[in-house]
Amino acid sequence: KFKPDGSVVNGLLAPSCLLTGQWGGAADAALEAAKGYALMTDAKTYMGFNDLSNTEWMWGHPQSVSQSDASYNFYYIDVVTPDAYNSFMADPHFMDLFEAGDIRLDLFQWMREGYLGYRKFRIRADQTGDIVVMRSAEMYLIAAEALAREGQLGEAVKPLNTLRNARGLADYDLTGKTQEQLIGDILLERRRELWGEGFGITDILRTQRAVAREALTKEEAEKKYDCWQQDGSYKEYNPEGHWFTSFPDGTRFVPNSTYYLYSIPEKETNANPNL
């Protein structure tokens, strides 16, 4: 799977079409790309995210002890293993976005000093983990969004339901939903499914939305949770929320802010005559 094939080519074409508003092309390429890559259906398989043999992975890179770039990849977002960073925690409100019965709910655990851990990424015992580049879940989400934006709501829920069913959920109820409501729910599903994989900021830019962060209310902040500790014990803590809920200048999050853009380093600008 480390060598791109026809599925990967379609997998690259699909988000390109989505970005440029070619809805039909995006849906066709995404559905073609996903063929043959079965979705994960249990939390045990979902928790780890470090094995190239995962049926959902379309493109990835195997890592070994002698050929590993160590701490620069997904598996170091592990919040359980002492050798990982243990600092990439979920928004305390993120868990509220999941429906009862969703296998991904099993990945949440209150831990450390009151942080909500999301055990999606795990490092292997030998301190490595295969690197995921593309998987079929993203393809189903691209197809669903593209079809919804094209106005084919009945067709859009088909790939959405393929993903929902694999995650332990019933079919999406389209009754009474508008096009915008369906698109919003598909984008919400992208947040649930692709958390931690690097899609957040690009989706914010692509859809011209704002970062969504809420501070804990007084009532929420006063709650107590039994938080797992790395020695296997539990301690009671109040929950910890976001440290930053506004831009660096203190203003609220808004769409299309320059704060969302990554600046090209000055050294690169000076060294590259093509810029």
What are these regions (language model features)?
Residues K1-N73, Y85-N86, P92-L275:
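Acidic/polar-rich alpha-helix caps and helix-coil junctions
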Residues V79-V80:
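Mobile gating loops/cap/lid regions near enzyme active sites that modulate substrate access
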